[in-house]
């Protein structure tokens, strides 16, 4: 089952046109706001969220729990080599965790079935899928029955952040809901 969905402004705009994405988001066990635009829209509509939950922070906290609980984690997505680097850097910072496996986000249908089998056979408890919106959400949804009970979440470009390929905004910008401006500056 898709355990959680991190929803930002881009995803909300896309799901108005993409009915499959809208369906997936409406059937996640947990949907959390990832972006100042979502918080602002909630305020305007009278729905106040306690806080923004940045994908990078959320994934890091889930991984810390996985370290403590010894949950096997599978990293799926990113460019070749990115997931491995993200795993290495996280391990250097927080200690080793059970790795169910990893695969980049580039694969064909034959490889796809091998990946699903690897996720299952590795005893995966946490599946981080970083293939970008809406591909990651749809992929997780389309494979949820095959994958069985696993905390699966789309994490977008989080592997690049974890690997050190993409810097996050300074903390003061994040605290003032300006991370979007920093990302726009870095990736116009």
Q: Language-model features: where?
A:
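A short, gly/pro- and small-residue-rich
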Residues: 23-27, 137-157
